[in-house]
Regions:
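Extended amphipathic ligand-handling, pore-lining, and cofactor/metal-binding catalytic surfaces
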Residues: 149-185
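Bacterial N-terminal signal peptides
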Residues: 24-38
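Predominantly extracellular/secreted and cell-surface proteins with exposed
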Residues: 82-158
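N-terminal secretory signal peptides that target proteins for export/translocation
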Residues: 1-21
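N-terminal segment immediately downstream of the Sec signal-peptide cleavage site
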Residues: 43-108, 177-218
Length: 225
């Protein structure tokens, strides 16, 4: 068997490119790829820089699902507002959590929304406080700090909003269903010595009203509450 060792490039009787021509073509392709990559990177940076919005205030409202509230009450579990959060009233049947910082980019919608205040879950002599809520829009979750532990857990999973409005200095997300995560269910069951909580439990419906448009740079203005 004869082994062919001669390159087809520039071989007699073939129409292949010469080595210098091939090198020139390869260099041109590399240059085009570099230019394309640079343009894509620049466009991406422009897209994020031009549409990233630092938040200056606002609030997130959480209305507890009626069936879930009844189940918690029947089991002797109380849910209370802590810190800067406000508890439901007859006129305002929802918990209110002030927005104290964060940054959001418009398209696609993403970023972080930072809150003050929190919730205390208690049963008998056991209790646990979750606070410093952060909505992570890119992951569609709400994380929380567990008081006294320094641990931050993924507390809630967020459904797609029924409506989104951006303008007039506000970002409004309406009709966001929130469900307990497996991690949060385990933490609550352990802290309260119960087996009541389960991942996927519908907690309720949230409405986010975030403000922007002043000199605030989206920095968190509350150290801890």
């Amino acid at each position: 068997m004869r082994t062919i060792t001669k390159s087809v490039i520039g071989s007699p009787g073939r129409s292949g490119m010469s080595a210098p021509a091939l090198v020139t073509l390869a260099s041109a392709i590399v240059a085009l790829l570099v230019l394309a990559l640079s343009a894509t990177t620049a466009q991406s940076a422009e897209r994020h820089d031009g549409k990233t919005i630092p938040l200056s205030g606002g609030k997130t409202l959480l209305k507890i699902d009626k069936d879930t509230a009844a189940a918690l009450s029947d089991a002797g579990v109380e849910v209370e507002a802590t810190g800067a959060a406000e508890a439901p009233t007859a006129k305002r049947p929802y918990f209110t959590f002030p927005i104290v910082g964060g940054k959001v980019h418009k398209d696609p919608l993403g970023g972080r929304i930072v809150h003050s205040g929190g919730l205390r879950f208690s049963a008998d002599s056991n209790s646990v406080v979750v606070k410093r809520f952060v909505i992570e829009l890119d992951r569609a979750v709400l994380t929380a700090k567990v008081a006294g532990t320094g641990q931050r857990i993924t507390l809630l999973r967020l459904g797609a909003p029924d409506g989104v409005k951006i303008g007039d200095g506000r970002i409004v997300l309406k009709g966001v269903n929130v469900r307990l995560t497996n991690q949060a269910a385990e933490a609550l069951n352990e802290a309260l010595d119960t087996d009541l909580f389960a991942g996927g439990l519908l907690i309720g419906e949230a409405t986010v009203i975030a403000k922007y448009g002043d000199d605030d740079k989206g920095e968190d203005r509350h150290d801890d509450d």
